[in-house]
Each structure stands twice: as C-alpha cells, then as structure tokens.
Design a protein with these regions (language model features):
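Bacterial N-terminal signal peptides that target proteins for export
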Residues: 3-17
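Bacterial N-terminal signal peptides
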Residues: 15-26
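Acidic/aromatic-lined carbohydrate-recognition and catalytic surfaces
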Residues: 30, 34-241, 245, 249, ...
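A structural motif
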Residues: 106, 252, 260, 399-400
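Beta-strand-rich binding/interaction modules
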Residues: 522-541
Length: 564
C-alpha cells in the first residue's frame, strides 16, 4: 500500500497522527483498559505482522482453534497426541504476550472428544467423568487448563448428549428392562406399532436387537455402536447437568454439543411425537443451567441442517456452527472468482437475520471446514492466494470463528474421515523419513497422509513472511483488536463494484468496513460515504492504492477500515 496516498485521502486518515490514534485504540472506549496499548505500535499492523493490543477477552469473543488431541502433539513418543503435548505447544497458539508475533493469537480452543472411547475419534463415550488414557491423566488435563488460563485461552470440550458407546456403564445397565437405566436410552419392544423397527438410516439399521434380550431393540442413529439417549428421562437430564458441573469445576469454559440437531430425531421417535420443539427446550434448559454455574460460559451446538432449521435451535442453544459458509458460500465464490451481487454478504445477513428473530442474543460461529468435511486446502486446490482470502472472509465476519487445526497451513484431505484428521505438520522429515519435530504425531496410516506431502509445515511457513500461516496471524490480530470485528453485527453494504464482497461490522463503540476483491483483476471503486471517515487497520498487501476519492484493491485482496 502506498502510505503517502492516505494523506491525500481525508476520509481514510488526515495524518499519520490520526492513523496512530485509531490504531492504538484511543478512539475506542474499551481500549484504554489494556496496559499493552502504551507499548504497541499499531500502525505497523496495517500492512505487516506486528503486535496489537488484543481486546477480546471473554470465552464468547475472539477466535477459537479446533484441535484433535490425537493428531496435535505427542509428548511421550507413542505416536499419539496428548494433553502434555498440547501444553508444550501452547506458545504456538497463544503465548499470552501481546508484544510478540510468533504465536497464532487464538483466544480459545475447542478440544474434540477427550473421554474414554473404543473409537479413535472418541464420539462414542464410555465414561463422561474421565479422560481418554491415550491422552494422559486427569492431572495432565488440569495442568493443560491451568497453562491455557495463564495465556488467556478459553477451553471448551466436545460433549455428546445424543448417544454413548455400548461399553458405557449406563448402557450396560439399560439392557435390563427392569433397571432404572433402561429408560435412559431409546428402547422399543418387538411388536410396538409406534415404531418402525425396519427403519434404515444412512445405509444401516436404525433399530438394533439386543443379543442378550431378544425382542428388545435400541436406536442407533449413527450405528449400532452408538446407542441413542432418551432425553425425556428426568434422571438422565439431571445426570448430564452433573456432567457439565464436573467439567466446569475442572476449568473448562463451555461445551461444543455434538449432533445437537439429532437429540430428538424424528426417525427414532414414536409416531406423532414432537421433535424440534422438544430438542430446543432441552438445549435451552442445559444452556440456562450452564450459565447458572458459569455466567461467562460459551457453548454451541452442531446443527448440520439448512439455515431455517438451524435458526430454530439457536433459540435454545444461543450459538450454532454456521454450516455452508466455507464449503458453499466462500469456496464457490472463490472457485469462480465471482462475488455476484455482493452475494456472500447478503446471504450472511439473511442467515443472521433468521438467528436474530429466533434469539436476539445469538452468537454466530463461522468456519471453513471441520473434522467431518474435506479440508478447504484441498477444496481450493492449495491456491495460497485464495486460501488467504477465504480466511479473511470468515475470520472478519460476524461471531466467533473456528479454525480447524492445520487450516492455517493449508492442510488438505480426501473424502475419507481419517484423511481429514491426520497429524499436525510441525516440521518436515529428515533424510531417514523421521519427523524432525519430536512432538510430531505418527498414529495415522501413511495412506491417509498422502494429501499433505507437499503442504508446508509450521517450521517452514514461519520463515516466510508471505506464508498462509503468517497471514492467519495478521487476520487473528486485527479480529481480536477491534470490538466491531469480534462483537459487532454484520450489515451487507454493496459498493456497486463488480467483484467486491463487502460488509459493515458495528458495535456500540466502533464501526468497521470490510472489503474483499474476489475477481481476477484489480478493482477501483469509492468507499460508501457512511464509512468514508474510517481509517485503514488492515490491508492485505502493498499493492492496495488510493487515488483521490477512490481505492484500488488487487485481485484477492482485502482491506479493513475501522473507527468510532
């Protein structure tokens, strides 16, 4: 960016002094509370990776990192990631010091399942009051939480209230029709006309006959190894509240509720039984309970449905993952370098409007890809420029964004689930094929790791100021330094320029205007008058230019303006 040109553009900044004032947060009422504001030079952060004063502090603010423990970092050499490995690598995620730029800068971690389980992924839970011994001890987990707290990192854990494993003691007891636990799960007796015991789900039987008690069938929406809970049972509901309290007492900040849209799946209910309304009521009950235990808690649900259905669940959960943002909205526009008629921003505004009508206090949770989806690095064919723009489009939108581990490196996958969950790439291998980083996990099959043979590791990307990793660091810093970006509401604003995707973010102390050029060519246009008084706080590169009353953004470039 030609910095001198901003002096010719009064509505960007009248002078370098005004630049510094806005960037240091002197125009933001909440910025003065941070002691780091006196030692950070925010003007540098506009065009390069530099320290900022990070203001996002609550569990419901900032940027989360979705982390599969098994694949992240191995502290004991058994090839499997563990809690001590995470602790050792925390400084990569956030070292707790605003004055450094070596860390990613995230403010929260979502740990994929940590409970004992017969499966590598952990979504069929044996014991809700313990940790997977593959990952370490409860003491190791508590130590990891303590180290996260020192760095200002909130931790939420995956919680499955929809089903358990068949090895869970609750399910074992439930197999006796006379045991009180029998009603904790969805059982049906042969001949009960209310249920279709021949029902198929995703290519398998929904109802599974108990080999010990012929004529009794239990529901397994995701397979016979995952028996479904019956949340109509009051004792089970009370037990789950005890589970939440147990983990809050350990120090977690909330939960990611797996399969939240399936707890009352219509396929497994008796004919005529209510589905969505009962599910929403359950989630409201559990979220209200969580808040009674920890008022600042942040929990959210996985509702992998269309936006209209998801909006219903927002009424109870308060926050849901925003499916479709990455694999449909962003990826499609970047594949074809076509912003349409500001399509992405308009679709977001429409989706978020549904949430607001359902729950005025909703918190959106955008993401590019997750552990169940092909990685965005592969979807966009490893195109670093497009991956940078994809990151900017969701990290700078409304809500609490979730980065899937390795996404900041451009990791790729196939369609098989195991390929989406392969080891984090800390360093390249030596001549003998062994990882140079001793904490590199090695549990995954070599055939599942082939997609990342050419993906650059953390060690390699940290040496390159233009790498995807370093760009993520910049984006996260601008997100967490500006209240409009981490707690503002999104408003689609059309510049009238073809190829430009743009929106405003507004909170009570600040406004921001976000612009991306999705086309293949540079685009010159005027910033809308309502945002013409704002100063630049982020530009993607030096080739952004201002000429008189117009701004020019190169292909796949991003500019963010902010001020009060």
């Amino acid at each position: 960016m030609k910095t001198s040109s901003f002096k010719r553009r009064p509505y960007f900044a009248a002078s370098a002094v005004f630049f510094a004032a806005v960037f240091a947060g002197q125009l933001l009422s909440c910025a003065a509370t941070s002691p780091a504001a006196k030692t950070v030079d925010p003007a540098k952060a506009v065009t390069e990776l530099a320290p900022v004063t990070r203001l996002a502090a609550k569990p419901s603010e900032g940027v989360y990192y979705s982390l599969f423990v098994r694949s992240f970092a191995d502290s004991n050499g058994d090839g499997i990631g563990d809690f001590n490995g995470i602790t050792a690598k925390l400084d990569y995620l956030n070292d707790g010091n605003d004055l450094t730029t070596s860390d990613l800068g995230i403010t929260g971690i979502w740990l994929l399942p940590i409970f004992p389980s017969p499966s590598y992924h952990g979504y069929d839970v044996d014991d809700y009051y313990n940790v997977n011994p593959d990952y370490g001890t409860m003491e190791d987990f508590e130590n990891m939480l303590a180290e996260c707290k020192k760095r200002g990192i909130s931790v939420i854990i995956d919680m499955t209230c929809n089903h358990s494993s068949t090895y869970n003691d609750w399910f074992k007891a439930s197999r006796d029709p006379n045991d009180p636990h029998h009603d904790w799960y969805r059982w049906a007796k042969e001949g009960d006309a209310r249920y279709n015991l021949k029902q198929q789900m995703w290519g398998h039987d929904l109802w599974n006959e108990d080999f010990k008690n012929k004529g009794y069938y239990y529901a397994g929406l995701f397979g016979k190894h995952m028996p479904e809970f019956n949340l109509d049972n009051k004792e089970l509901r009370a037990e789950f509240k005890k589970v939440m309290k147990f983990w809050f007492d350990k120090g977690v900040s909330g939960f990611r509720y797996d399969a939240a849209g399936h707890v009352y799946n219509r396929a497994e209910l008796a004919a005529g039984e209510e589905s969505a309304s009962k599910a929403v009521a359950w989630w409201k009950e559990i979220i209200d309970y969580n808040k009674s235990v920890y008022p600042d808690q942040y929990s959210l649900g996985e509702v992998w449905e269309n936006n209209a259905v998801r909006a219903q669940y927002v009424a109870g959960l308060g926050s849901c993952f925003h499916f479709d943002i990455g694999d449909k909205y962003i990826a499609d526009e970047l594949k074809y370098n076509d912003a349409g008629k500001n399509t992405y921003a308009n679709m977001l505004e429409s989706d978020l409007g549904r949430y607001a009508r359902s729950n005025p206090d909703y918190i959106d949770a955008p993401f590019l890809s997750n552990h169940d989806q092909p990685r965005v690095g592969g979807v966009l064919r490893g195109d670093t420029a497009k991956l940078k723009t994809a990151a900017a489009m969701y990290l700078l939108s409304e809500g609490v964004p979730f980065i899937y581990y390795g996404e900041e490196l451009g990791m790729k996958s196939g369609t098989k689930d195991e390929t989406k969950r392969t080891p984090m790439l800390w360093n390249t291998s030596n001549s003998a094929g062994k990882p140079k980083d001793k904490m590199q996990t090695t549990w995954a099959a070599a055939s599942d790791c082939i997609y990342n043979k050419k993906t650059l590791s953390v060690a390699e990307q940290e040496k390159d100021p233009s790498s995807l990793l370093e760009y993520y660091k910049r984006l996260i810093r601008v997100k967490t330094a500006h209240p409009a970006l981490f707690k503002g509401r999104l408003h689609a604003i059309d510049t009238g320029a073809a190829g430009i995707s743009s929106w405003a973010m507004v909170c009570d102390t600040e406004r921001a205007f976000v612009m991306h050029n999705l086309s293949k060519e540079a685009v010159t246009f005027s910033v809308p008058a309502d945002y013409a008084d704002l100063a630049a706080v982020f530009v993607s590169g030096t080739d952004v230019a201002v000429n008189g009353s117009q701004i020019t953004i190169p292909s796949l470039g991003t500019v963010v303006l902010a001020g009060n």
